[in-house]
Amino acid sequence: MVTEWKNFFKGCCMQLLNVGFGNTVMVGRVVAVVNTGSSPARKIREIAKKNGKLIDVTEGRRTRSMLVMDSNHVVLSSVQSDTISQRLQAMRIDLQLGECREQGKKVYNENE
């Protein structure tokens, strides 16, 4: 079973984003970070709840942001949407730098 997971993630950079209280989501699967104050956000929340795709990680606190995932799941978080956006941006920059480093290693190894 472990080998299957290793093969599944082989070549894939799995970065996790903290969405509060020790809960994480995969960075590559986040489609949107939505502020909960708008009417469309409430509609998204209702639809996700109706379809059984709503994940609440607020632990009873006020919902401050919603993460829409590529699987149509909606994650409710008590962390501000601006904070989550900043964390996402920082992680994506790190990922791009890592890819540049990997490409540099490949070029360096080919020249040897």
From Swiss-Prot:
Pfam families the record matches: RemA-like (PF04025)
InterPro entries the record matches: RemA-like
Top-rank taxon: Bacteria
Family statement drawn from the similarity comment of this UniProt entry: Belongs to the RemA family.
HAMAP family: RemA
Protein name: Putative regulatory protein DP2861
Organism: Desulfotalea psychrophila (strain LSv54 / DSM 12343)
Taxonomic placement: Bacteria, Pseudomonadati, Thermodesulfobacteriota, Desulfobulbia, Desulfobulbales
